Amino acid sequence: YAIMGNIEKFSTVACYGISGAAAVIVGKRIGEGASKEEIYDISWCLLLVSLLIGVIVSAALAALLPTIFIPYLYPLFHLEGLSLRIAATMCVVFIIMMPTKAFDITNITGILRAGGDVRMAFVLDVGSVWLVSVPITALTALVFDAPVALVCLGIQAEGLCKVPLGVWR
């Protein structure tokens, strides 16, 4: 996880940049008295940009996994055999979930908080971890003894519930 955690942090830099920009743009327009419809339109535009950035980052990571990570990065950490396959599997799951992560970061830390809806941002952040990710991960790993890919997907499952709830809000 230490390696994938660093790759994740590096990969989400652009997402947090868009999120910060979204907070400034949305907060400024609200402060200027923009209509609710205009704020929604701006928010959707920013969310689509963040989704696009998530897809671009996913594509870049998908290209880096077989060309840089597996042959050069992972051996620096003496990963081979099973540990190499687990690290690669974790990276693949992260690549698949990256667009939802980008969307969620912008929606929660950018748009909802800038709009003053910190309660919903808190519920989405904390609730999705403790009511979705932790139980799914515990069940897949401890009860069902599922493969690593499914356990990793359980860890990332919070994104699957944040997107529809965030859009609804």
Predicted regions and their residues:
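Short runs within selected transmembrane alpha-helices of multi-pass transporters and secretion channels
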Residues: 16-19, 94-114, 120-132, 136, ...
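Residue-level detector of solvent-exposed, low-hydrophobicity positions
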Residues: 8, 23, 137, 150-151
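Repeat-unit-sized solenoid/scaffold elements
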Residues: 1, 9, 55, 59, ...
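Short alpha-helical transmembrane segments in multi-pass integral membrane proteins
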Residues: 26-97, 140-169
